[in-house]
């Protein structure tokens, strides 16, 4: 089981591609390794199913926690449903692979990438994408590869190729670019308000590095003896398409050029034309070639009609520069935006509408304990900003069962989340956990970018002090030969019939998120740069409309949002606050009706709907962690009495004891002869013993009326609380 291994020196690291050793019954397999990260990728094809008119491609990324030396935290101690991270990486593999299969393919194809070992210096996702290409080539599946992917980071002014998790966290850019010899096929990025030029240069930097990985795949394929052949597309009976072209072109074109109609009216008219031509074909004689052709393939009419509509729409854009709704190529649809559309039981809300796309976003403020714990291979285990995206069937006028969120919902939520993270306030100034939910109420393209806009408004309505508002738009592309047209703010039909969906989100200062998907085999950097630059004025326009709804974040939180106080204590004193078995902290929470979270670094966060209660809890904790020194004088209250002395609370939650011999200069027979529970006294710290116990005295301390004949001592200064 030696297999064949090809090593590539890549930016000072070695990437190994091993084929022929693992998963021998898979169609094709490769173990791709870099450092201690190992990903096994397999590609398998089975014969197509009858009646399928699309490519049934399945891409699955699987994580095994043993890859990081961990045991799953579930009851069964076994990996269960794929975590969100695995779903996102599955999409990351699918998006650059799908456009590289021939459009006529209908066979079932499954690509499975399994992370078997993880090195925190080498993320597995880009290795899985490159491995998917190699495995597909080894399987002999018709495929317009090779394709490879790299990650680009930005530390200071320098681009970093395939940065580690730590470098990604420290840097201002996390960009993944995938490409073929023909150009870039996929881009995904999160950025800290970077300029358009910086992002374009980063994509170019990454694409240049891809060449080495593409060449390595070619060499492995050559040495394996597997020939990469692209079979000819099956011959398609053009009888129907010719008939439709002759009988429907004029009527469809008239509908597409009627800019005064609504989307519903346009869709209905196009459907009416199809029904009419179908009835006309039914009336033909049985020996007619058109009718014969249709009898052999009942989906031929549907597919040919869609193809004709697509061709006519694209020709209208290329030749006339007009879109189906009459907009110019760089024009944004009409925008409406409103904040505070729900009662303040919801901490923040907003409604954002662009054309027929409408999204309701809500923001909820939570406490640190509401952070999402991620049981996956990502070393960053907690999420304090969570964005969920819901796409119900009624948003497109359809009916279907309501199920758990699919990959699309997870992916769109993650993109909107990524777009807003760079503008969220620092944790030490605004310690809330934030959850935003975007409900798509109506969809006609670019719902993810509408979610970004609506979520910004909802967070501002909730009083979250964002560094800057974030807006976004989806850019489209029509490419016919050398003719290229870039579209701003694409709607549904342009997404469906076009060649690109390029989402760009950011602030006035710069870009915060990108996601580009292609339906063609690659685009040059120049065209991508043109699309990014064309998105800037659109984003500026959108942000202006958003600020008309709410100009700045609200000064006050919803009265139904928790109030948080955050401060720092000495980490060594965390145990003092928690107490034996958690008794101390439990007592504080019960006494003040608050919720208290303490991080390992000593950051204490107190949550309460009553600000005074939160301040009381803070006072108690600061008292517990306040260092007491010998000689200091404190007012206090007698809390309990024992035969040998009395206990005094000198600070919130902190007690010391007055021994019976320290109650008076004279001999005392019973403690109750001098003090009782509830008495207010002034005490001096006599000593702190080696067990940290505080011993107090009344001797020599004035009691505002003279419990002692000694002169009043000079007060000892108390260090300010920090």
Swiss-Prot record:
It is found in: Cytoplasm. It is an enzyme of class 2 (transferase). It catalyses: RNA(n+1) + phosphate = RNA(n) + a ribonucleoside 5'-diphosphate. Mg(2+) binds at residues 495, 501. Residues 712-722 have a biased composition (Pro residues). Residues 562-621 form the KH domain. One of its GO terms (cellular component) is cytosol. Residues 700-722 are annotated as: Disordered. Its EC number is 2.7.7.8. The keyword RNA-binding applies. One of its GO terms (molecular function) is magnesium ion binding. Residues 631-699 form the S1 motif domain. Its cofactor is Mg(2+). Belongs to the polyribonucleotide nucleotidyltransferase family. Involved in mRNA degradation. Catalyzes the phosphorolysis of single-stranded polyribonucleotides processively in the 3'- to 5'-direction. This is Polyribonucleotide nucleotidyltransferase.
């Amino acid at each position: 089981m030696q297999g064949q291994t090809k090593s590539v020196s890549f930016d000072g690291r070695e990437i190994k591609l091993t084929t022929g050793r693992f998963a021998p019954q898979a169609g094709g397999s490769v173990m791709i390794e870099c450092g201690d990260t190992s990903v096994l990728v397999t590609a398998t094809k089975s014969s197509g199913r009858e009646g399928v008119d699309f490519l049934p491609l399945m891409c699955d990324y699987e994580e095994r926690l043993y890859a990081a030396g961990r045991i799953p935290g579930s009851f069964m101690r076994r990996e269960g449903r794929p975590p969100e991270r695995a779903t996102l990486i599955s999409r990351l593999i699918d998006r650059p692979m799908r456009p590289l299969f021939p459009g006529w393919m209908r066979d079932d194809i499954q690509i499975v990438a399994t992370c078997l070992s993880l090195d925190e210096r080498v993320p597995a996702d880009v290795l899985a994408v490159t491995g998917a290409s190699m495995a597909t080539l080894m399987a002999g599946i018709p495929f317009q590869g090779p394709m490879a992917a790299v990650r680009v980071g930005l530390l200071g002014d320098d681009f970093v190729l395939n940065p580690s998790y730590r470098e990604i966290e420290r840097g201002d850019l996390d960009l993944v670019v995938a490409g073929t010899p023909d150009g870039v096929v996929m881009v995904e990025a999160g950025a800290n308000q970077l300029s358009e030029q910086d992002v374009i240069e980063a994509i170019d930097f990454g694409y240049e590095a891809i060449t080495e990985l593409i060449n390595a795949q070619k060499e492995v394929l050559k040495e394996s003896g597997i020939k990469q052949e692209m079979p000819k597309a099956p011959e398609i009976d053009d009888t129907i398409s010719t008939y439709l072209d002759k009988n429907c072109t004029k009527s469809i074109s008239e509908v597409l050029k009627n800019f005064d109609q609504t989307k519903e009216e346009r869709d209905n008219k196009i459907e009416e034309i199809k029904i009419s031509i179908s009835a006309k074909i039914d009336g033909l004689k049985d020996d007619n070639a058109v009718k014969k052709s249709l009898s052999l393939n009942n989906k031929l009419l549907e597919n040919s009609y869609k193809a004709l509509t697509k061709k006519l729409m694209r020709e209208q854009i290329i030749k006339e520069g007009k879109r189906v709704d009459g907009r110019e190529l760089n024009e944004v649809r009409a925008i409406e935006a409103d904040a505070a559309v729900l009662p303040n039981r919801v901490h923040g809300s907003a409604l954002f509408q662009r054309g027929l796309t409408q999204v309701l976003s809500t923001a909820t403020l939570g406490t640190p304990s509401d952070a999402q714990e991620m049981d996956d291979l990502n070393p960053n285990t907690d999420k304090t900003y969570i964005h969920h995206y819901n796409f119900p069937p009624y948003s497109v006028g359809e009916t279907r069962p309501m199920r758990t969120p699919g990959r699309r919902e997870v992916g769109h939520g993650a993109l909107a989340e990524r777009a807003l993270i760079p503008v969220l306030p620092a944790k030490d100034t605004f310690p809330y956990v934030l959850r935003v939910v975007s409900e798509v109420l109506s969809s006609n393209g670019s719902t993810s970018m509408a979610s970004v806009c609506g979520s910004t408004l909802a967070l501002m309505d909730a009083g979250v002090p964002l560094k800057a508002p974030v807006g976004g738009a989806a850019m489209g592309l029509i490419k016919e030969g050398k003719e290229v047209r870039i579209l701003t703010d694409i709607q549904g039909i342009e997404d469906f019939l076009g060649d690109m969906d390029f989402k760009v989100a950011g602030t006035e200062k710069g870009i915060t998120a990108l996601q580009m998907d292609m339906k063609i085999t690659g685009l040059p950097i120049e065209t991508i740069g043109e699309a990014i630059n064309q998105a800037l004025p659109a984003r500026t326009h959108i942000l202006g409309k958003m600020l008309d709804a709410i100009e700045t974040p609200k000064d006050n939180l919803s009265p139904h949002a928790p109030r948080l106080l955050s401060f720092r204590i000495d980490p060594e004193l965390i145990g003092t606050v928690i107490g034996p078995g958690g008794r101390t902290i439990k007592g504080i929470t019960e006494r003040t009706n608050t919720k208290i979270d303490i991080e390992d670094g000593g950051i204490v966060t107190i949550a309460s709907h009553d600000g005074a209660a939160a301040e009381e809890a803070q006072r108690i904790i600061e008292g517990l962690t306040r260092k007491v020194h010998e000689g200091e004088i404190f007012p206090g209250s007698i809390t309990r009495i024992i035969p040998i002395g009395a206990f005094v609370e000198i600070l919130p939650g902190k007690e010391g004891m007055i021994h019976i011999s320290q109650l008076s200069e004279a001999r005392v027979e019973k403690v109750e002869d001098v003090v009782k529970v509830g008495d207010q006294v002034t005490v001096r710290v006599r000593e702190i013993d080696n067990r940290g116990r505080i011993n107090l005295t009344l001797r020599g301390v004035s009691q505002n009326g003279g419990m002692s004949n000694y002169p009043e001592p000079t007060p000892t200064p108390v260090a300010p609380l920090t």
